[in-house]
């Protein structure tokens, strides 16, 4: 059932071609079949808006003829080519969303339970927020850390052996004397770090125990409590005294006694107290000649990165004979060779000898498991929410395999977490449209999982909202169905697929922009919300197809964080950490101040007094950042306030006066500014004579001028009492009168 496309002209129109109006299908057919000019114009209007008006009788006849003529069926090649285009159009977005689904499972960008339309997925309440204190966070973390350390120290590895299975062995005619158990020895192999003097990595083998394991037992008749078990203490996994252990492995060694019959007896020793290391080579050779076989297998517990490899569960290990697969210190590879032919893994377990056991990490012998259970990636049949522990629920004490616990867990979760209103399952149909034609319709689905990311939305409204917001490469239209809902899926031609990530990452290494290692700082922006409308109630009408046929575009609410700025001097991208500091702001660091003073000291065509004024003035301009002509009047007054005392103490008043006159010659300051600066300087000088400080100096005096300022006249030791001015040679008393 194809979707009905409504035209924008308000109906199918009138005339003979009214039945084909209302969409683009009838219009294109009318254009192809019409011969007269009136028919062409009528067909065009029909295809565009759905309205039609015959201008002459010839156009009506042409339109009627078009309706009578048989429509040619498209060739099979065109149909197949069109179908290939349909598959290609939907293939790329589907692959993208499948990839994002896997990445979001590993490192999610956001949590679905925090969304407003997914509030039913959030099972937590905010009751604890009333009593929450920031100071309690540290104590909670310390408590959790202490529990983990004590937990890891008390935990030990418990192995329960189900049996040793060797399917190739045929039962002996002497079944009464046939031995029905084998000797299993478990050793903990410690591969230590290689020291400088060592040629290879030192390997230590620590025996953990021997057990008699049943041979080819019938699991239906054997009780679980009768299986032999072995415990490995957690102290064995601590670093040794002489070497730092790199990895830990379990070595299983199964010894099967021989079958050589002599007076009704079977050769082979079953004593558990025999130490393997004390066995003599001659004795081993004799035992092998008698028919004794040894099978070995090795499994890694902790790898070189201290990652746990053996989790709780049931294991079946393929064993290999000692002669065929000698254990060496070289790097091991997984191989399965029988009669010169490589076998698939499942055939190995069906033909070769295997050892079955159950592994648990426990604090005590009857304690629950402490090691984390490996959870597979979520599928469309798995729930995303964690199961809440209810008072009536009883947990089994025995260890369950991962594959068994997964299926039973899902059933209990579905029964507990599914609300009553969703007990009645909805049938969801997905109909894929391409070029306004129905190309494919899926089978009915009884769940509300997203087909692209397998998210369980639980509600039809939440599913449609999720599809619309998270998979915007498609257009989803909701169509009511008596048994549920039909969702029309089409390609969003107006989708903006431009890069929306951090613009700084584009200028880094190739591929860095599309990687995600964690939260990063973005450019700070500010938006003013003038009006925040009230959130509308959830309604299914927002997912219906719009009447005008326009595609609803997702408006970008925030775009300032994607802007990219550049340094004007280096043309490098401005990082978000540098946004708070203006790169154009000319600060005066210490090295720049020293460089400025050094350059002024190198001048040879100015006297010492002018150099001192130039130093003070340049440092003053650099510090406050004066760059415009209209700032010079204020700069002069501020210079007098900050450096007036230095000018007076260093006898630089006449030099400063010449500097002001020079600035006036270049039209930088006015005469009024000169008068104000001189008046301010005179007041400061009068206060200094009275012993009062005019204003505190902002900078300390770096150099004391004991000699003359300009170098014209020399001051003798006899004339120091007069303190003559360096330029005019007038004494202080006459200088006061002039000022």
From Swiss-Prot:
GO terms assigned for molecular function: chromatin DNA binding; enzyme activator activity; histone H3K9me2/3 reader activity; lncRNA binding; promoter-specific chromatin binding; RNA polymerase II cis-regulatory region sequence-specific DNA binding; transcription corepressor binding; zinc ion binding
Effect of residue 196 to A: Fails to form a PRC2.1 dimer
UniProt keyword Repressor, yes or no: yes
Inducers of expression: Expression is induced by E2F1, E2F2 and E2F3.
Record's compositionally biased regions (Polar residues): 704-715
Pfam families: VEFS-Box (PF09733), Zn_SUZ12 (PF23320)
Region (Interaction with AEBP2 and PHF19): 146-363
Stated consequence of mutating residue 86 to A: Fails to interact with JARID2
Keywords annotated in UniProt: Chromatin regulator, Chromosomal rearrangement, Disease variant, Intellectual disability, Isopeptide bond, Metal-binding, Nucleus, Phosphoprotein, Proto-oncogene, Repressor, Transcription, Transcription regulation, Ubl conjugation, Zinc, Zinc-finger
Effect of residue 610 to V: In IMMAS; decreased trimethylation of 'Lys-27' of histone H3; no effect on interaction with EZH2
Tissue expression: Overexpressed in breast and colon cancer.
Entry annotated with the keyword Mitochondrion: no
Cross-link entry Glycyl lysine isopeptide (Lys-Gly) (interchain with G-Cter in SUMO2), positions: 75, 223, 390
Subunit relationships: Component of the PRC2 complex, which consists of the core subunits EED, EZH1 or EZH2, SUZ12, and RBBP4, and various combinations of accessory subunits including AEBP2, JARID2, PHF19, MTF2 and EPOP. Within the complex, interacts (via C2H2 zinc finger domain) with JARID2 and EPOP; JARID2 and EPOP compete for SUZ12 binding. Also interacts with AEBP2 and PHF19. Forms a monomeric PRC2.2 (class 2) complex consisting of at least SUZ12, RBBP4, AEBP2 and JARID2.
Miscellaneous: Under hypoxic conditions, the precursor SUZ12 RNA undergoes regulated trans-splicing with the JAZF1 RNA, resulting in a chimeric isoform which may be protective against apoptosis. The chimeric transcript is characterized by JAZF1 exons 1-3 joined to SUZ12 exon 2-16. The chimeric transcript is expressed primarily in the endometrium from late secretory and early proliferative phases of the menstrual cycle, but not in normal myometrium at any phase of the cycle. Its expression is slightly induced by low levels of progesterone, but suppressed by both estrogen and high levels of progesterone.
Its job: Polycomb group (PcG) protein. Component of the PRC2 complex, which methylates 'Lys-9' (H3K9me) and 'Lys-27' (H3K27me) of histone H3, leading to transcriptional repression of the affected target gene. The PRC2 complex may also serve as a recruiting platform for DNA methyltransferases, thereby linking two epigenetic repression systems. Genes repressed by the PRC2 complex include HOXC8, HOXA9, MYT1 and CDKN2A.
Protein name in the entry: Polycomb protein SUZ12
Source taxonomy: Eukaryota, Metazoa, Chordata, Craniata, Vertebrata
């Amino acid at each position: 059932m194809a979707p009905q496309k409504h035209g924008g002209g308000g109906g199918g129109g009138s005339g003979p071609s009214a039945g084909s109006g209302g969409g683009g299908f009838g219009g294109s057919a009318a254009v192809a079949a019409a011969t007269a000019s009136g028919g062409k114009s009528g067909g065009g209007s029909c295809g565009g808006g759905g309205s039609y008006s015959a201008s002459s009788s010839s156009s009506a006849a042409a339109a009627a003829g078009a309706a009578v003529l048989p429509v040619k069926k498209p060739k099979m090649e065109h149909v197949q080519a069109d179908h290939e285009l349909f598959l290609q159009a939907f293939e790329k977005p589907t692959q993208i969303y499948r990839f994002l689904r896997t990445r979001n499972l590993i490192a999610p960008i956001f949590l679905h339970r925090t969304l407003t339309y997914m509030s039913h997925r959030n099972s937590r309440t905010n009751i604890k927020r009333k009593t929450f204190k920031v100071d309690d966070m540290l104590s909670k973390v310390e408590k959790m850390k202490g529990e983990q350390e004590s937990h890891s120290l008390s935990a030990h590895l418990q192995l329960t052996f189900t049996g040793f299975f060797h399917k190739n062995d045929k039962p002996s005619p002497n079944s009464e004397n046939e031995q029905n158990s084998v000797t299993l020895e478990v050793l903990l192999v410690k591969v230590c770090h290689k020291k400088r003097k060592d040629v290879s990595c030192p390997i230590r083998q620590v025996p953990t125990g021997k057990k008699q394991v049943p041979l080819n037992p019938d699991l239906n008749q054997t009780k679980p409590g009768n299986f032999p078990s072995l415990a490995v203490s957690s102290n064995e996994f601590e670093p040794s005294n002489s070497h730092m252990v790199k990895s830990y492995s379990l070595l299983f060694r199964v010894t099967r006694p021989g079958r050589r019959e002599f007076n009704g007896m079977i050769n082979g020793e079953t004593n558990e107290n025999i130490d393997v290391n004390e066995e003599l080579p001659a004795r081993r050779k004799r035992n092998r000649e008698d028919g004794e076989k040894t099978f070995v297998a090795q499994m890694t517990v902790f790898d070189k990165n201290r990652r746990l490899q053996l989790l709780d569960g049931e294991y079946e290990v393929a064993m290999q004979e000692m002669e065929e697969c000698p254990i060496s210190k070289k790097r091991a590879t997984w191989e399965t060779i029988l009669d010169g032919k490589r076998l698939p893994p499942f055939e190995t377990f069906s033909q070769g000898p295997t050892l079955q056991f159950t592994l648990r990490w426990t604090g005590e012998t009857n304690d629950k498991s402490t090691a984390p259970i490996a959870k597979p990636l979520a599928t469309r049949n798995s729930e995303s929410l964690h199961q809440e522990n209810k008072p009536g629920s009883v947990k089994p004490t025995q260890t369950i395999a991962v594959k068994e616990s997964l299926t039973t867990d899902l059933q209990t979760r579905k029964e507990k977490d599914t609300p009553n209103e969703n007990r009645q399952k909805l049938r969801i149909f997905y109909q894929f449209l391409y070029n306004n034609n129905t190309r494919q319709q899926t089978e009915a689905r009884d769940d509300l999982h997203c087909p692209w990311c397998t998210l369980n939305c639980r509600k039809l409204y939440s599913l449609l909202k999720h599809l619309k917001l998270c998979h915007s490469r498609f257009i989803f239209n909701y169509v009511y169905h008596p048994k549920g809902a039909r969702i029309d899926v089409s390609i969003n031609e107006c989708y903006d697929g431009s890069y929306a990530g951090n613009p700084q990452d584009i200028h880094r290494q190739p591929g860095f922009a599309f990687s995600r290692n964690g939260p990063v700082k973005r450019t700070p922006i500010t938006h003013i919300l003038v009006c925040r409308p009230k959130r509308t109630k959830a309604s299914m009408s927002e997912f219906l197809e719009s009447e005008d046929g326009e595609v609803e575009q997702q408006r970008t609410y925030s775009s300032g964080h994607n802007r990219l700025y550049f340094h004007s001097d280096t043309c490098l991208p401005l990082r978000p950490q540098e946004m708070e500091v203006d790169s154009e702001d000319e600060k005066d660091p210490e090295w720049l101040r020293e460089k400025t003073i050094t350059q002024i000291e190198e001048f040879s065509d100015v006297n010492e007094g002018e150099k001192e004024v130039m130093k003070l003035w340049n440092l003053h301009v650099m510090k406050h950042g004066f760059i415009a002509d209209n700032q010079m009047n204020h700069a002069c007054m501020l210079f007098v306030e900050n450096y007036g005392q230095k000018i007076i103490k260093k006898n630089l008043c006449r030099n400063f006066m010449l500097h002001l006159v020079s600035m006036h010659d270049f039209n930088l300051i006015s005469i009024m500014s000169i008068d104000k600066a001189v008046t301010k300087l005179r007041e400061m000088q009068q206060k200094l004579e009275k012993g009062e400080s005019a204003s505190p100096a902002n900078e300390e005096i770096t150099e004391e001028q004991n000699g003359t300022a300009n170098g014209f006249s020399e001051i003798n030791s006899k004339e120091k009492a007069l303190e003559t001015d360096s330029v005019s040679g007038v004494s202080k008393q006459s200088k006061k009168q002039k000022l």
